[in-house]
Amino acid sequence: MARIKRGVVAHARHKKILKQAKGYYGARSRIYRVAHQAVIKAGQYAYRDRRQRKRQFRQLWISRINAAVRQSKMSYSNFIFGLKKASINIDRKILSDIAIFDLLSFNALVKKAKEALL
Protein backbone atom coordinates (compact mmCIF):
# COMPACT_ATOMS: atom_id res chain seq x y z
CA MET A 1 0.00 0.00 0.00
CA ALA A 2 1.33 3.38 -0.98
CA ARG A 3 2.03 6.06 1.59
CA ILE A 4 -0.24 9.08 1.23
CA LYS A 5 1.32 12.42 2.01
CA ARG A 6 -1.21 15.12 2.89
CA GLY A 7 1.18 17.99 3.61
CA VAL A 8 0.02 19.88 0.53
CA VAL A 9 -3.64 19.65 1.57
CA ALA A 10 -2.93 20.75 5.16
CA HIS A 11 -0.78 23.64 3.96
CA ALA A 12 -3.51 24.80 1.59
CA ARG A 13 -6.12 24.60 4.36
CA HIS A 14 -3.91 26.58 6.74
CA LYS A 15 -3.22 29.21 4.08
CA LYS A 16 -6.95 29.56 3.44
CA ILE A 17 -7.70 30.18 7.13
CA LEU A 18 -4.78 32.60 7.55
CA LYS A 19 -5.96 34.49 4.47
CA GLN A 20 -9.43 34.83 6.02
CA ALA A 21 -7.80 36.07 9.26
CA LYS A 22 -5.78 38.74 7.47
CA GLY A 23 -6.06 42.06 9.29
CA TYR A 24 -6.76 40.51 12.68
CA TYR A 25 -4.63 41.68 15.62
CA GLY A 26 -1.56 39.80 16.82
CA ALA A 27 -1.56 36.01 16.94
CA ARG A 28 -5.07 35.92 15.50
CA SER A 29 -3.60 36.72 12.08
CA ARG A 30 -0.41 34.64 12.31
CA ILE A 31 -0.92 31.41 14.25
CA TYR A 32 -3.18 28.85 12.60
CA ARG A 33 -4.86 27.49 15.74
CA VAL A 34 -5.72 30.95 17.09
CA ALA A 35 -6.64 32.25 13.63
CA HIS A 36 -8.98 29.30 13.06
CA GLN A 37 -10.85 30.05 16.29
CA ALA A 38 -11.01 33.75 15.39
CA VAL A 39 -12.38 33.02 11.90
CA ILE A 40 -15.05 30.67 13.32
CA LYS A 41 -16.08 33.28 15.91
CA ALA A 42 -16.15 36.00 13.24
CA GLY A 43 -18.47 33.81 11.18
CA GLN A 44 -20.79 33.40 14.17
CA TYR A 45 -20.87 37.16 14.72
CA ALA A 46 -21.51 37.78 11.02
CA TYR A 47 -24.39 35.26 10.96
CA ARG A 48 -25.97 36.80 14.07
CA ASP A 49 -25.50 40.38 12.92
CA ARG A 50 -26.99 39.80 9.46
CA ARG A 51 -30.23 39.09 11.29
CA GLN A 52 -29.80 41.91 13.81
CA ARG A 53 -29.17 44.43 11.01
CA LYS A 54 -32.74 43.93 9.78
CA ARG A 55 -34.13 44.57 13.28
CA GLN A 56 -31.94 47.61 13.85
CA PHE A 57 -32.90 49.25 10.56
CA ARG A 58 -36.60 48.70 11.30
CA GLN A 59 -36.08 50.33 14.73
CA LEU A 60 -34.32 53.27 13.07
CA TRP A 61 -37.12 53.75 10.52
CA ILE A 62 -39.77 53.63 13.26
CA SER A 63 -37.97 56.19 15.43
CA ARG A 64 -37.53 58.52 12.43
CA ILE A 65 -41.22 58.22 11.51
CA ASN A 66 -42.19 58.76 15.15
CA ALA A 67 -40.08 61.93 15.37
CA ALA A 68 -41.61 63.32 12.17
CA VAL A 69 -45.19 62.42 13.17
CA ARG A 70 -44.87 63.97 16.63
CA GLN A 71 -44.26 67.36 15.00
CA SER A 72 -47.87 67.08 13.79
CA LYS A 73 -49.14 66.29 17.31
CA MET A 74 -49.79 62.62 16.56
CA SER A 75 -48.36 59.35 17.89
CA TYR A 76 -46.61 56.77 15.74
CA SER A 77 -49.13 54.03 16.53
CA ASN A 78 -52.10 56.24 15.64
CA PHE A 79 -50.35 57.27 12.42
CA ILE A 80 -49.76 53.67 11.33
CA PHE A 81 -53.32 52.71 12.31
CA GLY A 82 -54.67 55.70 10.36
CA LEU A 83 -52.67 54.70 7.27
CA LYS A 84 -54.02 51.15 7.49
CA LYS A 85 -57.60 52.46 7.80
CA ALA A 86 -57.02 54.76 4.82
CA SER A 87 -55.74 51.76 2.80
CA ILE A 88 -52.33 53.36 2.30
CA ASN A 89 -49.79 50.54 2.13
CA ILE A 90 -46.35 52.13 2.37
CA ASP A 91 -43.65 50.29 4.27
CA ARG A 92 -41.68 51.89 7.09
CA LYS A 93 -38.49 52.24 5.06
CA ILE A 94 -40.23 54.37 2.44
CA LEU A 95 -42.15 56.34 5.08
CA SER A 96 -38.85 57.12 6.78
CA ASP A 97 -37.30 58.34 3.51
CA ILE A 98 -40.35 60.48 2.77
CA ALA A 99 -40.19 61.97 6.29
CA ILE A 100 -36.54 62.94 5.77
CA PHE A 101 -36.45 64.09 2.15
CA ASP A 102 -40.02 65.19 1.32
CA LEU A 103 -41.72 66.72 4.34
CA LEU A 104 -44.65 68.13 2.34
CA SER A 105 -45.66 64.68 1.09
CA PHE A 106 -45.20 63.25 4.57
CA ASN A 107 -47.47 65.92 6.05
CA ALA A 108 -50.08 65.01 3.42
CA LEU A 109 -49.87 61.37 4.58
CA VAL A 110 -50.28 62.50 8.20
CA LYS A 111 -53.35 64.49 7.18
CA LYS A 112 -54.83 61.43 5.41
CA ALA A 113 -54.15 59.28 8.48
CA LYS A 114 -55.85 61.82 10.75
CA GLU A 115 -58.90 61.95 8.45
CA ALA A 116 -59.15 58.15 8.43
CA LEU A 117 -59.18 58.07 12.24
CA LEU A 118 -62.14 60.45 12.49
UniProtKB/Swiss-Prot annotation:
GO terms for cellular component: ribonucleoprotein complex; ribosome
Highest taxon in the source lineage: Bacteria
Pfam families: Ribosomal_L20
Coiled coil (UniProt feature): none
Key words of the record: Ribonucleoprotein, Ribosomal protein, RNA-binding, rRNA-binding
Gene3D superfamilies named among the record's database cross-references: 6.10.160.10, Ribosomal protein L20
Any one of the GO BP annotations: ribosomal large subunit assembly
Disulphide bond pairs: none
Record carries keyword Lipoprotein: no
SUPFAM superfamilies tied to this protein: Ribosomal protein L20
Molecular function (Gene Ontology), one example: rRNA binding
InterPro entries associated with the record: Ribosomal_bL20, RIBOSOMAL_L20_CS, Ribosomal_protein_bL20_C
Cited function: Binds directly to 23S ribosomal RNA and is necessary for the in vitro assembly process of the 50S ribosomal subunit. It is not involved in the protein synthesizing functions of that subunit.
Protein family (similarity comment): Belongs to the bacterial ribosomal protein bL20 family.
Name this protein carries in UniProt: Large ribosomal subunit protein bL20
Organism of provenance: Buchnera aphidicola subsp. Acyrthosiphon pisum (strain 5A)
